[in-house]
Amino acid sequence: MSIKPKRLVNAYEERMLEFLQTCLDGTYKIHTQVSLCQFCELDSNLDIELKKFFFSSSVDALITNSDYKPCLVVDFQSSYHDYPEARERDRKKATLLALAGVPLLYSRIKEFGLLQLYSQNEEVIFNLFTGERRENAKALIQKYCGLSAFINV
């Protein structure tokens, strides 16, 4: 029996993390593959299914402020997330993050070279090749990071 190290992120996640880094100033830190239970506290009134999910789920990217308090979660979506089981997990994760007051953005490659950043309320599509609408994508990320200053964190 042998155990070997492996990469923490795939190529898509690596590109997304690099993009996020360019959108933030030195005040914020990006953490990858962080368990929900590392940055959210459990409420004893949570239903059993959400409790189980809470302890077994992680986020793709957690952005924290300089005090390491959560500001924003970015979930990297692939076509895998179109399956009903994955949608249910995404729904549970969104519910838990909403209860914790941590904003959530999704990112997804829509078509070759087009990156979609979206929440329940808004969306930005950014062209990775031409840079068109990059400032809009950056502003959306910064807006959600800034919202955390007003949220119960």
Predicted regions and their residues:
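Basic, amphipathic alpha-helical patches used to engage nucleic acids or provide basic targeting signals
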Residues: 67-120
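Conserved RecA-like helicase motor-core motifs
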Residues: 29-31, 105
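Short, well-structured alpha-helical interface segments that form or flank functional binding sites
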Residues: 11, 15, 56-57, 88-92, ...
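Basic, glycine-rich
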Residues: 101-153
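Long, low-complexity, intrinsically disordered polar/charged segments
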Residues: 12, 19, 23-26, 54-84
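Nuclease catalytic cores
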Residues: 1-21
